Amino acid sequence: MKADMPLANGLQALPSNDPHMAMRRVRRLHFVGIGGAGMGGIAEVLHNMGYTISGSDQAANGMTRRLQDLGVRVACGHAAAHIEGADAVVTSSAISATNPEVAAAHAQRVPVVPRAEMLAELMRFRYGVAVAGTHGKTTTTSLIASLLAEGGLDPTFVIGGRLNSTASHAKLGQSRYLVAEADESDASFLFLQPMLAVVTNIDADHLPTYGGDLGRLRATFREFLHHLPFYGLVVACLDDPGVAELLPSIKRPVLTYGLQETADVRASNLRYSGTRAQFQVTMPDRAPVQVDLNLPGAHNVRNALAAIAVAAELEVPSPAIQRGLQQFAGIERRFRAQDITIAAGRITWVDDYGHHPTEIAATVQAARDAWPGRRLVVAFQPHRYTRTRDLFEDFTQVLTAIDLLVLLEVYAAGEAVITGATGRDLARAMRMRGVEPIFVPALADCPGLLRHVLRAQDVLLTLGAGSIGSLARTLPTTLSPEAGSC
């Protein structure tokens, strides 16, 4: 770690912008699985605070390359030698206890710190804004960070997606504000103790973490919200049934948002124009504000309302809120739309991370609102066999509302195959409903098939949280008129 001055006990002082005097014994932090969005973002912030950061991952990706460009030492593969000299080892829930670096840390009595606990340490001496919810966390966190920055508050942020305006997942700001996602997938958000918490929605997902019990999931959200101090603030989406059901039991101040007339922060006069949404916002103690949001869909209007509520609470002026929403540059793989030319003519291609039935339905509706009357072609890769099993009927229902579906095999994300929960099983269930999807077992075959089925003026959606995201780098080329048939 960079030192401002030596200490009498031989330790070094922390950098002047680091309030964590209790961490003065920590100079070097090693991240196992540093290529993950959440891990890499925290590593980048700590690197910029002056800590010596190293890390490892199974394979290089955009995150590892960015960190290497910043001067972080990143190893490909895992080996016990990588932790030599580390004062603590940071891991994500995806890393097994049998990982050689984790095992070596335990053997050497080096603290092994969960990712969320390290995020909690970053938040401990700051004004923490934590965004929780099954859907919309990344977009809402990005919007909040953008509005605070537009208002001159210069926040630190850690986001699960790459913010296009900064080309990064994270930034070390100079103010006391820290904005971050709160991850319910492994219940690790219980490490956090923010000053302000947003809850976008509570839906059935990651149920294996909660023993398959939706009630237990909701109870864990309640526990998270009670980690706020009694003078903190919960910003909650009144439109979501899961959140609305929880509100009577929340013993903290609450500010609601949504499209309902009873919401504290409410959108009205909503209309769509291409990939933008226009609406008026009414909120306590401010004049109504007219908003031109550079995002499509009612779900993004709600995400924007959450960000507006937080920005208003932190006294960002209304003109800055309007500018921030109008100029918002979006996030990688969140409704990223572009027109491309294929052999049949021009089409619109939207790439999106959505992989839950609720997210798919919202993205499909946003596309229909943006380009009414055009044929909608969706290439969807289900993510995890457990999710496909738990939400099988919901997937079947939402996917039947698409004009033409290209269905890929499930992206396992390390899970074993579950009988009855494969992509082929989904395709079979849809055929029983009278819908004929095109099943493609291998992702590599998808571009070639799309060349044959796409027509001029189609809207193509590529959806999923797995390897389908790699199409974003190659699809315009593989679908171009100059490309050969696959």
Place the predicted regions along the sequence by residue.
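N-terminal leader/targeting and accessory segments in enzymes
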Residues: M1-M118, L233, P241, R266, ...
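Nucleotide phosphate-binding/pyrophosphate-handling subdomain across enzymes
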Residues: L14, P19-H30, G38, V45-M49, ...
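Conserved hydrophobic helix-helix packing surfaces used for dimerization/oligomerization
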Residues: R28-F31, V89, V129, P155, ...
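Phosphate-binding loop of NTP-binding sites
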Residues: V45-N48, Q68, H82, S93-L238, ...
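Short internal beta-strands
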Residues: Y51-Q58, V234-L238, V377-F380, A401-A412
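Beta-strand->loop->alpha-helix junctions that form or flank phosphate-binding loops
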Residues: S56-D57, A75-H78, V113-A120, V158-G161, ...
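P-loop/Walker A phosphate-binding loop and immediately adjacent motor/lid segment at beta-alpha junctions
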Residues: E101-V110, H226-G232, K251-P253, A362-W371, ...
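C-terminal helical cap/extension that packs against the catalytic core
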Residues: R266, T396-A456
